[in-house]
Curated annotation (Swiss-Prot):
Swiss-Prot/TrEMBL keywords: Autocatalytic cleavage, Cytoplasm, Hydrolase, Protease, Proteasome, Threonine protease, Zymogen
SUPFAM superfamilies per record: N-terminal nucleophile aminohydrolases (Ntn hydrolases)
Quaternary structure, from the entry: The 20S proteasome core is composed of 14 alpha and 14 beta subunits that assemble into four stacked heptameric rings, resulting in a barrel-shaped structure. The two inner rings, each composed of seven catalytic beta subunits, are sandwiched by two outer rings, each composed of seven alpha subunits. The catalytic chamber with the active sites is on the inside of the barrel. Has a gated structure, the ends of the cylinder being occluded by the N-termini of the alpha-subunits. Is capped at one or both ends by the proteasome regulatory ATPase, PAN.
Annotated protein name in UniProt: Proteasome subunit beta 1
EC number(s) per entry: 3.4.25.1
Subcellular location: Cytoplasm
Control of this protein's activity: The formation of the proteasomal ATPase PAN-20S proteasome complex, via the docking of the C-termini of PAN into the intersubunit pockets in the alpha-rings, triggers opening of the gate for substrate entry. Interconversion between the open-gate and close-gate conformations leads to a dynamic regulation of the 20S proteasome proteolysis activity.
A GO CC term assigned to this protein in UniProt: cytoplasm
Main location: cytoplasm
Length: 197
């Protein structure tokens, strides 16, 4: 059986925070396994990751990052920044490049400032204002490039993220569902919601 799967996740950074969004469909080969999977995983109360790739690998990475964030807080008395966590994850992925974690991850958060980063399975790290991962990336990026402006508000960024996921779902057979998981991270904290399409 061909075990090809897919997804689309997006991240958008604006002045007041970060928006992460993902479809909720899990696929295996050409079959939809479920329409109710969470693809955005909170790591701390201010940092989350999106998942594209091997579920087991991303669950392991999430456990490592959660432990590192707790250790950092106890050792230094302050939370790890999103940039520091992204660099840590980049190092972890690069250390394992000969037996890689089969994932592409967006890490987003608001500790000192809003931050979005995209990481490939080998630890390549790119900080940007917006990004996408998964099989629907070409469709989502087209929407993000057209609609992103640095002065977007949180609600406008959320609408843009949902539009990008919806566009990917209409063209990529491995992206889909009847709802979008959206996580908003601001200096006040993190909020998760599911938006029906």
């Amino acid at each position: 059986m061909n075990r090809k799967t897919g997804t689309t996740t997006v991240g958008i950074k604006v002045k007041d925070g970060v928006i992460l969004a993902a479809d909720t469909q899990a696929s295996l080969d050409h079959m939809v396994e479920t329409l109710n999977i969470r693809k955005i995983i909170p790591i701390t109360d201010r940092i989350a990751i999106t998942t594209a790739g091997s579920v087991g690998d991303v669950q392991m990475i999430a456990r490592i990052l959660e432990a590192e964030a707790r250790y950092y807080y106890f050792a230094w008395g302050r939370p790890m920044t999103t940039k520091a966590m992204a660099n840590l994850l980049s190092n972890i992925l690069n250390e394992n490049k000969w037996f890689p974690y089969l994932v592409q991850i967006i890490i987003g958060g608001y500790v000192d400032e809003p931050t979005i980063a995209n990481l490939d399975p080998y630890g390549g790290l790119i900080f940007d204002n917006y990004t996408a991962t998964g099989s629907g990336t070409p469709f989502a990026i087209a929407i993000l490039e057209e609609g992103y402006k640095e002065n977007l508000g949180i609600e406008e960024a959320k609408e843009l993220a949902i539009k990008a996921i919806k566009a990917a779902g209409s063209r990529d057979v491995y992206t889909g569902s009847k709802k979008v998981q959206v996580v908003t991270i601001t200096k006040e904290g993190m909020q998760e919601e599911f938006i029906k399409l």
